[in-house]
Amino acid sequence: YEMLRSLVGSEMCIRDSAYYAQKAGKPDIAADMCTRAEEALAGREKDEYLLLYMGLFIAYYLMTNPERGWEYAERCIDWSLRTNTLKKYRFSCDMVEALKYEMRPEVHLALPEEFPLYRADGVYSVSELGRYFYQQAEELARRYDARNGNSGYMDRLKEIMSN
């Protein structure tokens, strides 16, 4: 609990703390962190720079309130189409993690036509979305790791898949 409280210094940490507290079986702390994060987001729902920090917040909501999680996911998926590759990688990894918590086989989403899996009927297969985000993260990880001469980005993706 104290470790989580020490992380509350920034909005990113508040959002991430909600996810980690929920995953650790601390729903009261998670709910408190979520409330704080929602307050910090008020009036800033269109700030695309937040994409880097929203993935685990989406995961928290897919664990606790899937409809709210998908509201954030719709917005962030749109942002992810026109962001830099680092934010795209991080968001894709976080969506791979988040989608583990969606138990329905299909979801109804309002996604932009530019989204590679766009469907006019708005019905998306959760497993197909998971594959899309995994493949995107994997492709970017391979490029970053080749550039860096190590396996750090793929290691992160493998860790997400193994948890």
Where are these regions (language model features)?
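Residue-level signature for tetratricopeptide repeat
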Residues: 19-20, 59-61
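Single conserved hydrophobic/aromatic residue that forms the stacking wall/gate
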Residues: 1-14
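TPR-repeat structural position
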Residues: 27, 66-67
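Structural motif corresponding to the intra-repeat A-B loop/turn of tetratricopeptide repeats
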Residues: 24, 63-64
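C-terminal non-catalytic interaction modules
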Residues: 81-163
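TPR repeat positional signature
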Residues: 14, 54, 92-95
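Alpha-helical junction/boundary sensor with strong preference for TPR arrays
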Residues: 5, 34-45, 79-83, 141-148
